[in-house]
Amino acid sequence: NTSYAECSVSPEWLNLQEFSTWCTSQPLYNKTVLGRRTALDKDLLIPNNKVYSKEACLIIPEEINKALVGKRKTGKDRGLPCGIFKHGKKFITYRDSDKRFDSFSTLEDAARDYQQKKEGRIKGLLLKYGEYLDSVTIHALQEFTIKSRSIYN
């Protein structure tokens, strides 16, 4: 997967025992939450992080982890922010709630719409999973904003 091409692992975690010790100390390690698996996240705590380490990583519900990732682009959409596509002269964003698309005349309007949808989705997932999350994860999700992240990946 090319999205991991620039990523690395901390020297400490290159020792499998150290990584394993960290994993097993995490409350959600190897658990299911509301019927969903959990996943290792590297950039909720540190936006745009490229290093897997105990300082940066969390084990969170997979649904949250996937929601944090921007929508993948096709070749013709390169140069546009994640979650925004071009169709003719219009800029398109995807509506998760009813699996439809919204269209905008300007890139700025589409980006604002994408930001509001994404942040709203994260807040909704915080409500859904909040009772299962630790205080560090809850705080990171409460502070989540698109502005702090690179949406041009």
Language model: regions and residue ranges:
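A short, exposed loop/beta-hairpin motif centered on an aromatic-Gly-Thr core
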Residues: 8-11, 97-108
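Generic alpha-helical secondary structure signal
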Residues: 23, 56, 105-108, 118, ...
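Amphipathic alpha-helical interaction segments
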Residues: 27-30, 109, 122, 137
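Short, cationic Gly/His-enriched loop motifs
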Residues: 2-89
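The canonical J-domain HPD catalytic loop and its flanking helix-turn segment that engages Hsp70
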Residues: 42-44, 119-124
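Extended, polar beta-sheet/loop recognition surfaces of beta-rich domains
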Residues: 121-153
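Short beta-strand motif preference
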Residues: 90-96
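An aromatic-rich alpha-helical recognition segment common to small helix-rich domains
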Residues: 19, 84, 93, 104-118
